Regions:
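Positively charged, solvent-exposed patches that mediate nucleic-acid binding
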Residues: 1-127
Length: 127
């Protein structure tokens, strides 16, 4: 039987999530990088773990409808999931701003792909 080529896994397992408030607080308290955009804020901090991890902070104040909040979170998770293997070991917090829910999902996806690429460039050479 031929050996299988290694294919990347695109799961969004618990190991790729920030799970408790102390993990969120560590990033809020001392982010290594801030990427600010009209529609979102990314805070990132290098971690000692094996891979990049994501935390979402989606306030009802910024996105009123629950369905819109869920859609934004789904797009963020999906784009992160596809890019996580190539990102440096870091903890990332994603905070959407007002107006993010008004964008089409395709535009949200494009913005987030650009954000992950910018974050990757920001940490180049530090990991």
């Amino acid at each position: 039987m031929p050996a299988r080529a290694h294919t990347p896994t695109y799961h969004f397992s618990k190991a790729r999530r920030l799970l408790d408030s102390s993990e969120y607080q560590a990033v809020f308290a001392a982010p290594d990088r801030r990427i600010s955009h009209r529609y979102y804020l990314l805070l990132a901090r290098l971690n000692d773990g094996p891979e990049a991890r994501l935390g979402l902070v989606v306030a009802r104040k910024n996105i009123r409808m629950a369905s819109d909040r869920n859609r934004v979170k789904r797009v963020v998770r999906e784009t992160f999931r596809h890019r996580a293997g190539s990102l440096p070991r870091m903890d990332v917090l994603f905070l959407p701003r007002r107006g993010m829910d008004g964008l089409a999902p395709a535009r949200q996806t494009r913005l987030l792909r650009e954000a992950w690429a910018e974050l990757d460039r920001a940490f180049q050479g530090e990991c």
